[in-house]
C-alpha cells in the first residue's frame, strides 16, 4: 500500500505540538528525525527526548487529500499560511519482506549462531538459535547484543540459571539455554517483548525452561548464576541496587547497552558489589562484566 508523508521542520520544543497537529489532520503515524542526523541515545522514562532542530514527519494514507491537510495545518499557531513543508509519495514496498531479505545468519564467539527462522542454518552442528524478533528489540545486529552473545558463548553455562533483565526478543535468554543453561528467566516492561520471547522460545524448543515476567509479576526472591542486562546506561545506574542482588555469591554479571563514554559511571554503580573485569568495547558501545563479591 502506498503512503504519503508530510515533513515539517521545527525545534525540539515545538515538535510534540506539531505531532499532535498532524495526528488531528489525519496522520496514521508520526516520526521524529534529527535534521542533522545526530542520534539521541537515552530518553528518560516517560520522556520523549528530541533534538534542537527536528523534522516531524506525518504518514498519511495515499487517498488523503493533502490540500485539506495543509489547510488544516495553516490554522495552527506555530505554522500559519504558507508554512514550509515537504510532501512526498512513498514507494509501495513490502517493507517486512525487504527487512527479512537483509537479515542473515550471524556467528557469535566459537559456537553460537543466530539464524532468522525463515533461513537454513549454515552449520547443523553449531549452537543455533532460530529467531523471529517480531516487534521487540534484539536480532544480534546491534553491537550491544553482539557483545552480550559473545560473552555468553565464552561461558560454561551447563546446568546454570540465567536471568535476562530486559529480555526484548528473548535472544539472550534463549541463547543461554541453547548453550547449556538449565533455566532462564526473562524480565521486560513491554508485554510485546514477553510475547516475542515466548514465541521464539517455542520455536527453539526451550519454552519449558524459560520463565517470563513483567516486573510487577516477578518473584520476590530471584537468584541466578549469571545475570545479563542489555538495556541503557541510565536504567542500569538507577536499577543497580535491584540488579546487583540477583546474582548468587560468585555469580557473573554482564551489562551492555552502554556507550563507551558512559562506562565509568556504570562501573561506579556496581563496583561495591562486583569484582569488575576490564571494559570491552565494540564500535562506540561497550560491555561491562564482573563477579559477585
Curated annotation (Swiss-Prot):
Gene Ontology biological process terms in this record: methylation
Effects seen without this gene: Mutant lacks several methyl groups in protein L11. Null mutant is perfectly viable.
Residues annotated to bind S-adenosyl-L-methionine: 145, 166, 188, 230
One GO CC term on file: cytosol
InterPro entries with a match to the protein in the record: Ribosomal_L11_MeTrfase_PrmA, Ribosomal_PrmA_MeTrfase, SAM-dependent_MTases_sf
Similarity comment text for this entry: Belongs to the methyltransferase superfamily. PrmA family.
Name this protein carries in UniProt: Ribosomal protein L11 methyltransferase
Species whose genome carries this gene: Escherichia coli (strain K12)
Gene that this polypeptide is encoded by: prmA
Amino acid at each position: 500500500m502506498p503512503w504519503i508523508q508530510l515533513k515539517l521542520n521545527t525545534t525540539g520544543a515545538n515538535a510534540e505540538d506539531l505531532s499532535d497537529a498532524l495526528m488531528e489532520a489525519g496522520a496514521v503515524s508520526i516520526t521524529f528525525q534529527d535534521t542533522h542526523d545526530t542520534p539521541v541515545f537515552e530518553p528518560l522514562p516517560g520522556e520523549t527526548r528530541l533534538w534542537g532542530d527536528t523534522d516531524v514527519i506525518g504518514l498519511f494514507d495515499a487517498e488523503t487529500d493533502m490540500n485539506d491537510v495543509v489547510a488544516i495545518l495553516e490554522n495552527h499557531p506555530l505554522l500559519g499560511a504558507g508554512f514550509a513543508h515537504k510532501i512526498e509519495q512513498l514507494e509501495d514496498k513490502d517493507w517486512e519482506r525487504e527487512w527479512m531479505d537483509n537479515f542473515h545468519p550471524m556467528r557469535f564467539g566459537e559456537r553460537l549462531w543466530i539464524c532468522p527462522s525463515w533461513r537454513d542454518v549454515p552449520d547443523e552442528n553449531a549452537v543455533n538459535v532460530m529467531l523471529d524478533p517480531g516487534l521487540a528489540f534484539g536480532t544480534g545486529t546491534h553491537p550491544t547484543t553482539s557483545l552480550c552473545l559473545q560473552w555468553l558463548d565464552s561461558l560454561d553455562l551447563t546446568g546454570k540459571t540465567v536471568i535476562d533483565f530486559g529480555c526484548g526478543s528473548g535472544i539472550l535468554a534463549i541463547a543461554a539455554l541453547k548453550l547449556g543453561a538449565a533455566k532462564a528467566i526473562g524480565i521486560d516492561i513491554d508485554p510485546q517483548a514477553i510475547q516475542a520471547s515466548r514465541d521464539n522460545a517455542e520455536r527453539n524448543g526451550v519454552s519449558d525452561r524459560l520463565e517470563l515476567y513483567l516486573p510487577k509479576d516477578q518473584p520476590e526472591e530471584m537468584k541466578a548464576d549469571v545475570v545479563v542486562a542489555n538495556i541503557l546506561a541510565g536504567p542500569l545506574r538507577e536499577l543497580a541496587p535491584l540488579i546487583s542482588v540477583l546474582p548468587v555469591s560468585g555469580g557473573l554479571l554482564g551489562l551492555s547497552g552502554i556507550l563507551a563514554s558512559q562506562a565509568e559511571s556504570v562501573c561506579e554503580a556496581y563496583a561495591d558489589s562486583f569484582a569488575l573485569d576490564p571494559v570491552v568495547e565494540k564500535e562506540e558501545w561497550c560491555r561491562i562484566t564482573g563477579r559477585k563479591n
